């Protein structure tokens, strides 16, 4: 039946930037979460200077020591886990590059759901 996805926060957040590139960055984060987890939560936060988009999942996560490696192009951290999972290993790289090109950033941390949290921050 596929993953369960929940979205919380305001109806929309506004940021300045290239719409297609930003859409692709967010889509990459959601795609990664749903590949490895059964539950995904997307939280939008509209702060005074930036919008935050948190994508949390209940998957296996990435240990802290390997999180920076996850941003390397074509990196697939666990071949045993990813060999039957589609993807090129470029999603996180492109998402972070897009965030930084827009004056923002992308960070990975532990998720309250037990897996990984990808936090995309984009200035207004």
Feature map (PLM): residue ranges:
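Short alpha-helical Gxxx[C/S/T] motif in the catalytic ATP-binding
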Residues: 91, 95
């Amino acid at each position: 039946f596929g993953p369960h996805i929940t979205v919380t926060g305001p109806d929309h957040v506004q940021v300045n930037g290239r719409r297609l590139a930003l859409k692709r960055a967010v889509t990459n984060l959601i795609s990664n979460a749903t590949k490895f987890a059964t539950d995904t939560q997307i939280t939008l936060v509209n702060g005074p200077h930036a919008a935050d988009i948190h994508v949390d999942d209940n998957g296996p996560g990435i240990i802290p020591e390997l999180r920076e490696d996850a941003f390397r192009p074509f990196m697939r951290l666990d071949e045993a886990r990813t060999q039957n999972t589609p993807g090129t290993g470029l999603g996180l790289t492109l998402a972070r590059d897009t965030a930084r090109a827009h004056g923002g950033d992308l960070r990975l941390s532990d998720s309250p759901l037990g897996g990984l949290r990808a936090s995309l921050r984009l200035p207004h």
